[in-house]
């Protein structure tokens, strides 16, 4: 497949000029370590180190050494702080880390991690070249991309380790579709591209449903075996991996050589798996408490009218901090162990809650937006029900919008 080195060099040069090598804002190795003063922050997230390590240990026990773990820490460890958690990953002996951005790769390597580092999405060519110093293994699921990646590797005088992605489960995102003759030819051709070392074949499941996962797994096993036979790949040198958190917990036969848990590491699992602990809590403060008469309206658009004389607490958090407008007149927060309702529209930096039935609430009190306070809890189920989306859609934003504080327990 002909390709102009001059055109490739020009395109990469323009990409590097127009975009930084990092696909996310620079991350800190120490951002949020316990010296952060919560009194200086309008909102913050607390990251439970002991819970994170418990979840890794629980998963290691369940796998019993039969499959290795690749801890997926993309999106700054799902908003939990990759720099904060890498010491635990290293201490727990996790052999592989999965990331999305070059910035995450930098933090992983600077933490002292010497193990396997995988990018769990297809890179832009400019990203791929900039990531070479991190010895990151790249996902390849397209022949044209493979050829261009090969030229980059050749120019740097080194082979590029790749994971060949197959579209076995119908995700239609990063993998070669092996159901067509052209797709099968392309997959074999990728294994023959010079300067690329295929060390793994992988897929990704599209649905959290055991039957769907098993169907995708059956297709993957058949396609991967066909590919290894036709391309004459040494099975002993190929890692097969497919399982995300759901498949890891619910479909044991999907474990293969390696699993790629993400959410499970942070306690985000299906409800039946209570053995995994929640790692993040989202918190704020009460700024003030005011009294308003019956009939007053609350917030922009007058969406809530007080049905009685009421005490309203002003909370120092809003949608710019990740507490979305979806919680308008629907959300519940915890103050001093009381469940109190959000009233009126959530503003950019403020929300109001009705504390009429919680007379002990005062300025300066801690507010739990997600997590525990005493015996009370704001649960994943109620948050997802109100927001109408996965909890990860929220906590990745909470963690990347607010200071993070690492707690030992």
Curated annotation (Swiss-Prot):
Organism: Pseudomonas taetrolens
Field pH dependence: Optimum pH is 8.0.
Protein name according to UniProt: Broad specificity amino-acid racemase
Described purpose of this protein according to its UniProt entry: Amino-acid racemase able to utilize a broad range of substrates. Is mostly active with lysine and arginine and, to a lesser extent, with ornithine, whereas is about 10 times less active with alanine, methionine and ethionine. With phenylalanine as substrate only a trace activity is detectable, and is inactive with glutamate. Plays a key role in the catabolism of D-arginine and D-lysine, that allows P.taetrolens strain NBRC 3460 to grow on these basic D-amino acids as a sole carbon source.
UniProt signal peptide: 1-23
Superkingdom in the source lineage: Bacteria
Disulfide bond found in the keyword field: yes
Chain residues that bind substrate: 173, 348
């Amino acid at each position: 497949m002909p390709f102009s080195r001059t055109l490739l060099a020009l395109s990469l040069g323009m990409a590097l000029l127009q975009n930084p090598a990092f696909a996310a804002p620079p991350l800190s190795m120490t951002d949020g370590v316990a010296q952060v003063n919560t009194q200086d922050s309008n909102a913050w997230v607390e990251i439970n180190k002991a819970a994170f390590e418990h979840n890794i240990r629980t998963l290691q026990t369940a796998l019993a050494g039969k499959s290795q773990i690749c801890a997926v820490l993309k999106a700054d460890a799902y908003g939990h702080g990759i720099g904060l958690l890498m010491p635990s990953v290293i201490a727990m002996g996790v052999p592989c880390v999965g990331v999305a951005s070059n910035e995450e790769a930098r933090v992983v390597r600077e933490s002292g991690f010497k193990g396997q580092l995988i990018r769990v999405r297809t890179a832009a060519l400019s990203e791929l070249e900039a990531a070479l110093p991190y010895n990151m293994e790249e996902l390849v699921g397209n022949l044209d991309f493979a050829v261009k990646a090969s030229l980059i590797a050749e120019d740097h005088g080194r082979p590029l380790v790749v994971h060949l992605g197959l579209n076995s489960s119908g995700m239609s995102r990063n993998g070669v579709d092996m159901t067509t003759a052209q797709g099968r030819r392309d997959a074999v051709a990728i294994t023959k591209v010079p300067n690329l070392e295929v060390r793994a074949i992988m897929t990704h499941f599209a649905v959290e449903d055991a039957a769907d996962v098993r169907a995708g797994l059956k297709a993957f096993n058949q396609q991967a075996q066909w590919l290894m036979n036709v391309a004459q790949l040494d099975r002993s040198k190929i890692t097969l991996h497919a399982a995300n958190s759901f498949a890891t917990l619910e479909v044991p036969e999907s474990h293969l050589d390696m699993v790629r848990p993400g959410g499970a590491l942070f306690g985000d699992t299906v409800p039946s798996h209570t053995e995994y602990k929640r790692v993040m809590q989202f918190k704020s403060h009460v700024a003030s408490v005011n009294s308003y008469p019956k009939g007053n309206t609350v917030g922009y658009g007058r969406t809530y009218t007080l049905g009685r004389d009421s005490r309203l607490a002003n909370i120092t958090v809003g949608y710019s901090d990740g507490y979305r407008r979806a919680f308008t007149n629907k959300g519940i927060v915890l103050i001093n162990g009381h469940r109190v309702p959000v009233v009126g529209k959530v503003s950019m930096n403020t929300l109001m809650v009705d504390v009429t039935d919680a007379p002990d609430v005062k300025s300066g009190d801690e507010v739990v937006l997600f997590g525990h306070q005493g015996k009370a809890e704001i649960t994943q189920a109620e948050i997802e029900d109100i927001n109408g989306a996965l909890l990860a859609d929220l906590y990745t934003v909470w963690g990347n919008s607010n200071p993070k504080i690492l707690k030992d327990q």
